[in-house]
C-alpha cells in the first residue's frame, strides 16, 4: 500500500468510526458500495476522485 492509499484508508476508517457509522450507513449516505468502502479501508482499492468526492460530500467532510 502506498502512502496516499494508506492515508485515505486510515482517514476514512477514523472518520467513519468517529461518526459512529457502519459501512452500510456510509454506503447509503454516500452512494458508494459497501464493498468498495471496505476495500478502501483495507487499502486494497484506490478510489477515483469521483468516489472520493461522493464520500466527502456524503459524510460532509472537506476534501484536502
Feature map (PLM): residue ranges:
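Short alpha-helical DNA-recognition segment
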Residues: 20-38
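Short alpha-helical elements of helix-turn-helix
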Residues: 10, 49-52
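A short, Lys/Arg-rich alpha-helix, primarily the initiator
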Residues: 1-18
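Intrinsically disordered, low-complexity segments
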Residues: 16, 31-33, 46
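Key DNA-contact positions within bacterial/archaeal DNA-binding proteins
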Residues: 24, 35-36, 45, 50, ...
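Hydrophobic micro-packing sites on short alpha-helices
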Residues: 16, 26, 51-59, 64
Amino acid at each position: 500500500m502506498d502512502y496516499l492509499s494508506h492515508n485515505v484508508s486510515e482517514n476514512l476508517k477514523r472518520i467513519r468510526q468517529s461518526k459512529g457509522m457502519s459501512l452500510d450507513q456510509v454506503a447509503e449516505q454516500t452512494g458508494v458500495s459497501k464493498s468498495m468502502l471496505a476495500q478502501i479501508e483495507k487499502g486494497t482499492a484506490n478510489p477515483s476522485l469521483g468516489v472520493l468526492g461522493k464520500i466527502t460530500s456524503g459524510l460532509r467532510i472537506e476534501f484536502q
